[in-house]
Regions:
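Low-complexity, acidic interaction segments enriched in glycine
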Residues: 1-114
């Protein structure tokens, strides 16, 4: 891959669902306006909530807004995940939220914080 400002097939790797990943230093992860910039790797959207929830349980604490793996609204070449609600990836926009792992949503994403 060659570094460039715009995402593209020669500049950006994709996830298993053919959506671009993002390695960046920003605060666009977890709860909206997380505040602190961190190096992070975003999975991109398009991942089923059951898969992203299981990934979080395997590598972190299993909760979308705590730990080193958190929910992310970021989207590049895919549709952005829906904001927290009963039909979205997470139950609420609060630290105590959980993944909506059984609702069948197929458009979720996460971010690994470094």
């Amino acid at each position: 891959y060659t570094c460039a400002a715009a995402d593209g097939p020669t500049t950006t790797p994709v996830n298993a669902y053919n959506i671009y990943l993002q390695l960046i230093y920003d605060n666009a992860w977890g709860l909206v306006a997380a505040g602190t910039n961190r190096h992070n790797l975003k999975t991109g959207p398009g991942i089923p909530v059951a898969v992203i929830a299981e990934l979080d349980r395997k590598v972190d604490d299993g909760l979308p807004y705590t730990g080193t793996f958190q929910f992310s609204l970021w989207a590049s070449n895919g549709a952005a995940p829906a904001a927290p609600a009963a039909t979205s990836c997470t139950t609420t926009a609060a630290v105590a939220s959980t993944w909506n792992a059984n609702n069948g949503n197929t458009n979720c994403g996460g971010s690994t914080l470094f």
